């Protein structure tokens, strides 16, 4: 994995804009500013964020929001897992979903007319992150698959 030290430094500084820039992407904080502001609080000690993507993830059984349908989440690819955060508007609580890298079979990206989509295969099901910016989806999937391969080789 390239840029590990730079990613580590940016993660420690919580410089998410710098992380987007490092990956050759423009920051996408639309609808996820609150999630970005608390992301560092949900990381484990020495966990490194490699890339971020925002997109719509459907409500799950663990979601506590009163709303229905898909919500805008920030999803972080870290050295240990894929971490999804949704800051709920009404209760100011934060929904999280976390998938360890060793649970993940593959990550794929597809591109539509306007947006991209990321599909995470966890064996027992699929996690779909929809309405992502196309370049963000591509970078996320490429880096995720690199990390998964590295973890398998270790």
Regions found by a protein language model. Name each.
Residues 2-25, 36-48, 57, 66-71, ...:
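Acidic, Ser/Thr- and proline-rich intrinsically disordered linker/docking segments
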Residues 62-64:
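Proline/serine-rich, acidic intrinsically disordered regulatory regions in eukaryotic membrane-signaling
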């Amino acid at each position: 994995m390239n840029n590990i030290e730079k990613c580590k430094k940016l993660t420690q500084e919580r410089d998410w804009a710098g992380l987007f820039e490092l990956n050759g992407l423009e920051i996408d904080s639309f609808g996820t500013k609150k999630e970005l502001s608390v992301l560092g609080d949900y990381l484990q000690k020495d966990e490194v964020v490699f890339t971020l993507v925002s997109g719509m993830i459907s409500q799950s059984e663990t979601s506590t929001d009163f709303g229905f349908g898909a919500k805008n989440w920030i999803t972080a690819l870290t050295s240990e897992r894929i971490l999804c955060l949704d800051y709920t508007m009404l209760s100011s609580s934060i929904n999280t979903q976390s998938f360890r890298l060793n649970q993940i079979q593959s990550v794929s990206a597809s591109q539509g007319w306007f947006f991209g989509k990321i599909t995470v295969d966890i064996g027992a099901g699929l996690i779909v992150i929809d309405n992502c910016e196309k370049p963000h989806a591509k970078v996320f999937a490429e880096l995720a698959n690199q990390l998964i391969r590295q973890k398998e080789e270790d």
